[in-house]
Amino acid sequence: EERLRGLLDIPVLHDDQHGTAVVVAAALMNACEVAGKQPEDIAITICGAGSAAVSTARMLNSMGIDKKHIVMVDSKGVINTQRTDLNSIKSEFATERRIGTLQEAMNGADAFIGLSRGNLLEEKEIMAMKERPVIFALANPTPEISYSRAKSIRPDAIVATGRSDAPNQ
């Protein structure tokens, strides 16, 4: 993408990155309205640190959600300032909080945005979230947690997946 931007004099849209970011941002704004939460005040855990996750975090930041309210988790744990293995892109979203695990990142989170791998969210992590949590389990083809499982654990949750067979795609 960066190379194309340097070569071309037209806008470049990377669908997997920017398309995902736009849809997630719009859905999150709507979910906040339904849940009675102010977007700029919510704590967000983003699971995944690939291009879609980074673009989503950047989009949310551009919409007024401070980076300090976003905790990003990759396959090695929370992306924080204590880690020495971060590239410049991951460093952009490194939290200063001294937490290391997904479980710790989910403690008190208002929203979970999953852009990682399937079946990684457990009941304890969902239960650690605030009232009326927003859970976007978007890994495909298998979400981080299924719609039905998330709703059975937290009936108060606003849940979306990328699955067309789920009621809230």
Predicted segments with their positions:
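General beta-strand structural signal in soluble alpha/beta enzymes
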Residues: 12-15, 46, 72, 113-114, ...
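Short, flexible active-site loop motifs that bind/organize anionic cofactors or intermediates
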Residues: 60, 116, 140
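Active-site regions of enzymes building and remodeling cell-envelope glycoconjugates
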Residues: 9-10, 87-93, 156-157
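Short capping/connector residues at structural and topological boundaries
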Residues: 17-18, 84, 98, 126, ...
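Rossmann-fold NAD(P)-binding glycine/threonine-rich loop
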Residues: 2-8, 119-169
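Pre-Walker A segment
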Residues: 1-19
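Glycine-rich phosphate/diphosphate-binding loop of Rossmann-like nucleotide-binding domains
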Residues: 18, 22-113
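Short, well-ordered loop/turn elements at secondary-structure boundaries
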Residues: 7-9, 41, 106-109, 129-131
